[in-house]
Amino acid sequence: MENMNDKWKKIALEAVPFLLLWAAFFVFGLWLRRQIPLDVPPGELHGLDYNGHGELFADHRLITFTRFRHPLFGWLMSPIPLFGARIANVSFIAYWGYLSFIFSGIVAASVWMVYRISAQMEGVGKVSAAVCAGLFACFGYVRYLAAGPESFSVSMLLALAVLWWGVRSPFVVGRQPLQGKGVYDKLVWFLLFVVATGITLTQGAKVVLAYLVSRRMTKRDWICLASGAAAAVLAAVGFYVVKLMLLGSGGRTVSSAFADLFSCIPHDLTIVQRLRMLEMFFFEPIVPHGVPYSVSEIVVAYSSWWQYALCAAIYLATAVGAYRMRSTLLVKMIVVMFCVDAVIHLVMFWGMSEAQIYCGHWFYVLPILIAGAWKKGVIKKPSDML
């Protein structure tokens, strides 16, 4: 009984910084709620443009939370929706300021966590660990500016939760299950599931899949089987979502809706144009959500050869690190969830923007995998690194 009390006391002490951080967000949200001009039309940007895509930004980024991805997203993003405020009426500057406040706190903690993880890997010195943490900060910053105030704060919160859980639990980073199968691990899994589900239902499904893989399916054959099964299920869900988006309340049939969707895809393309589309699909970093890829604009595109070279170098280092760490459960879960993301984006006609390992939901694994390229990723002390 005494040990259980000590465990709960430890959990409570570790949760205090996160609770204080959320309390700060809550108070700031109360203040910001008083600054919202409620007479502004939804999506109005007050004449501000966003990299030449102000119309897209107004329609996509500042729309009401209930129409964006998942209703829980609004609750996780800020306390504003709890007080009946319409996020569509938040001015661009006020909304950006709020996310900047979240960014400054969470990214600092996340970068520190990345440094501690990398520094504990065999063969990775403190300087190299600092480089990995710097890479994390750079990519997080790029994601923040490139994608705009969409889901960065919650993605950072999810990244921090994964890192915190991964560091504290020897089950994730170790080769075999060790300790930590009790209440503590279950609690962190549950919190991670809540946060992920708040982003999208598919993110929550991927957390459940990762839990099953890490607990029961440790062989590579089972990994492939789980990836295929999950991809099939999520593909079906994806088509169902597309159907709902297209049908709406107009009473159209499913066949006519899909006919309209596929009619948007150009078929009279040359070989060069098809190769260009393939290149854009896999290598352009940002594609607007909810818009068929074949008819959407690219918000961020590479303009110089060295940017593509840097991208290729990062891909190579990440692949080498993943291969060298292929026996760890962490990499196995990443592979499974990456496969699921790829299927989702293929089905939904989005680019591979979030499915790419260096962007979106995946950028936080970069420093760990790149560190693994230096030395095979074996954590010395997976527990008690905080």
Please give the residue ranges for each predicted region.
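Membrane-lumen/periplasm interface segments of specific transmembrane helices
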Residues: 24-30, 224-310
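Extracytoplasmic catalytic/substrate-binding loops of multi-pass membrane glycan-assembly enzymes
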Residues: 28-56, 64-80
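Transmembrane-helix motifs of polytopic, lipid-linked glycan transferases
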Residues: 101-122, 317-321
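Hydrophobic, aromatic-rich transmembrane alpha-helices
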Residues: 113, 288-293, 304-328
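Transmembrane-helix signature of polytopic, membrane-embedded enzymes
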Residues: 114-138, 332
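Short acidic/glycine- and proline-prone juxtamembrane loop motifs at membrane-interface regions
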Residues: 144-152
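Specific aromatic-rich, kink-prone transmembrane helix
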Residues: 154-174, 185, 365-369
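Membrane-interface alpha helices of multi-pass inner-membrane proteins
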Residues: 179-216
